[in-house]
Amino acid sequence: VGSEMCIRDRYIDYLALHKLNYFHWHLTDDQAWRVEMKCRPELTEKGSIREGEIFGLYPGKYQPLPYGGYYTHEDVHEIVRYAAERHITVIPEMDIPGHCMAVLATYPQFSTTPNEPKKAALTWGIFNKFNNVLAPKPEVFDFLKDVFSELCDLFPGQYIHVGGDECAKRWWQ
């Protein structure tokens, strides 16, 4: 984490150097959920880890070692503070309703195909054939309320980005 924080600090310093005042932080995707959720600890425990890593361009070289990690609340507070000292607002992104394989690996019942096993993706891209979208179900909306409430407590800015891209509507039909 130490070297990662150093890289992060440098990145924020570069934003400040170039007079950029927003840091859009992409914290979730098909591959992992990268921020601690105390309201949903199983999401952090399971959704932040994938079964391996692929190096290089697709198809790349597969390394079957668990890969993952996440930012704790303390990490987030430190990043937000560091950025604010440089007049930068951090905008977190929680990619929904698509790009949710890491969420669905933790909560398969949130899927439109809940009986099919899900796991966090190893590669990048659009996974329409795997149905990586959240279903419009009451328990999904409860989940979103929990997660957005916690994100609002963590990030003092006025925006949270929800992604919304590459979501195959056919899964909702």
List where the protein language model places each region.
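An active-site-proximal structural segment forming one wall of the substrate-binding cleft
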Residues: 18-23, 76-97, 132-161
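Short alpha-helical segments and helix-capping/turn motifs at coil-helix boundaries
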Residues: 8-11, 76-77
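Aromatic- and acidic-residue-enriched carbohydrate-binding clefts of CAZyme catalytic domains
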Residues: 31-85, 100-139, 170-173
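Residue-level detector of functional hotspots within protein domains
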Residues: 11-13, 29, 62, 120, ...
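Catalytic domains of carbohydrate-active enzymes, especially glycoside hydrolases
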Residues: 10-30
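Short, small-residue-biased leader/transition segments that mark boundaries at the very start
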Residues: 2-7
